[in-house]
Amino acid sequence: MWSVQKLLWGCRSLLPQGCRSFSLGNRDLRKVDFMPQPKNTDRWDNKRALYGVYDNIGILGDFKAHPRDLIIGPFWLRGWKGNELQRCIRKRQMVGPRMFYQDRENLTKRIRFLYKRFNRYGKHR
């Protein structure tokens, strides 16, 4: 009896098996490490380093100053959000008469292009 079992065990690849004949990857799932590796993140990048930088204005200044008043940039963009077309129109309204001729012409061309673009394509139609 033992010799028959050994014979069957030796040529088991010839006998039909009750399991899959193909592999789905790693057979032993106990050996797979499912714990992800920790990410190396920069804790002092621009976004994280400036988080909460204006919180002391409200605490020390009795909430009289708004952080948008402290942002340095073009005055037609301070504390204002919008798309490129709205930004160009706002710039033309506020500094248009003081611009050089070629800069104003380039701005007008850009406004014309964006106006056509926004009216022909996209979710703005």
UniProtKB/Swiss-Prot annotation:
Main location per the UniProt record: mitochondrion
Membrane-spanning ranges: none
Annotated localization: Mitochondrion
Organelle transit peptide: 1-29
Pfam families per UniProt: MRP-L51
GO CC field: mitochondrial large ribosomal subunit
Keywords linked to the UniProt accession: Mitochondrion, Ribonucleoprotein, Ribosomal protein, Transit peptide
One GO BP: translation
Similarity comment: family membership: Belongs to the mitochondrion-specific ribosomal protein mL51 family.
PANTHER family listed in its UniProt record: LARGE RIBOSOMAL SUBUNIT PROTEIN ML51, MITOCHONDRIAL 39S RIBOSOMAL PROTEIN L51
Protein's name according to its UniProt entry: Large ribosomal subunit protein mL51
